Amino acid sequence: RYIRRQRQMCIRDSDGRIWVPKSKGDQRKPKDIPENERDYYLERKYPSFGNLVPRDLASRNAKEVCDAGYGVGSTGDAVYLDFSDAINRLGKDAIKAKYGNLFEMYNRITDDDPYETAMMIYPAVHYTMGGLWVDYNLMTTIPGLYAIGEANFSDHGANRLGASALMQGLADGYFVLPSTINNYLAEHKLDNLDDQNEAFISAEKEVFNKLEKLLSINGTKTVDDFHRELGKLMWNQCGMERSEEGLRKALEELPKIREEFWKNVNVPGTSNDLNQALEKANRVADFLEFAEFMLIDALDREESCGGHFRVESQTEEGEALRNDEKFAYVAAWEFSGIDKKPKLHKEQLVFEEVKLSQRSYK
């Protein structure tokens, strides 16, 4: 996973070049494939930016060439990230100074030397977009509830980088909260609550019943089995590229997976001790509900925007095509219950100083 995610860091620099063989199923070693038989597809398609295109473009194109049969490696789900030109141009020491840590980790995991051969990479699921709204003091719309780090939206746009994620967590935790949350606590008297409160009793009973239900199923499939099945469905139908056909197919398949989960999952252990299998079962149960919201939202938004790319909404050059007239709003879906249609809430996006325009990386 680490190797796959590091592509996003390397690709931001012009030293690494991404390519695949021009012939499908070419199993030769990268060094044995001559230049005229290589397709530097990002440089070919986006000559102005090449390998420095935004990550949504780079990721979508990588999956596209792999799905078309040009991928490399034993699974065919990889493309080459090649530093040979940069090494020849700048020298090994210069590249080592910039990427030595990454190259060393890749070598430890794969036993391949990136200084001698191209690395194999493939896009992986990254952070979801957005975050909770917070005010200047990092408090959400719920009084007393603060959101810090990547849980809030304050420093992140649609595309996130790991370094800025770390930065935000440190900044919020070390510098902002100590100066803001203390003021709130000093000004607000906390109510005296105990475990006999009606709300607590109701919530505790609901959680206990859910835990016992998960433990009592005693089925034949593990939590990981369902997690993997759900992940594959979402990756293929609601990942970097979405289509109406694929989203509708996923909306048909998801309830079946969810139904089987609650009938056939096997969660070992008890609820009386630390039980990581039970913890994960709870998370996957949540994923099975949240995934449906993602599918419904992706199907409803008939445009391409940011990381949401609908194949029906693209330019002749294959770029994301927005529909600002109909979809210039933030969508929030209200949960109405399992197998019930959620309610859509809209907040219009109004731009007074900036004119919306079509992006291009040609």
What do the predicted segments below correspond to?
Residues 3, 74-75, 115, 141:
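Short, structurally constrained coil/turn elements
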Residues 1-11:
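Single conserved hydrophobic/aromatic residue that forms the stacking wall/gate
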Residues 86-88:
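N-terminal export/ancillary region detector
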